[in-house]
Swiss-Prot record:
GO molecular function: small ribosomal subunit rRNA binding; structural constituent of ribosome
GO biological process terms, semicolon-separated: translation
Gene source species: Leuconostoc citreum (strain KM20)
Gene3D superfamilies referenced in this protein's UniProt entry, alphabetically: Ribosomal protein S20
GO cellular component: cytosol; small ribosomal subunit
Family of the protein in this entry: Belongs to the bacterial ribosomal protein bS20 family.
UniProt xrefs under InterPro entries: Ribosomal_bS20 (IPR002583), Ribosomal_bS20_sf (IPR036510)
NCBIfam families according to UniProt: S20
Protein name: Small ribosomal subunit protein bS20
Domain of life: Bacteria
């Protein structure tokens, strides 16, 4: 455990940030995995799942969980399966 007051505050802040970010990151990863699984299985509701995954990626980017280029790259890779 940290002894210095500023280090104690950082521990509290880091935990708070983690508790806020982790559910959003999990939702983003789940949406992408659900789409990839459906694409591998050849299901026909890919357009709908792509829309959900794309929205989750955009949300993760707007919350600062992933960078702009990663969001664009992920969406581009997923879009190849929709065609």
């Amino acid at each position: 455990m940290p002894v210095i007051e500023s280090a104690i505050q950082r521990v509290r802040l880091t935990k708070k940030q983690h508790d806020r970010n982790e559910p959003q990151a999990s939702a983003y990863r789940t949406a992408v995995k659900r789409f990839e699984k459906a694409a591998a299985a050849g299901e026909d509701n890919l357009a709908e799942l792509y829309k959900i995954a794309s929205s989750a990626i955009d949300r993760a980017h707007s919350k600062g969980l992933i960078k702009k280029n990663k969001a664009s790259r992920e969406k581009s890779r997923l879009a190849k399966y929709v065609k």
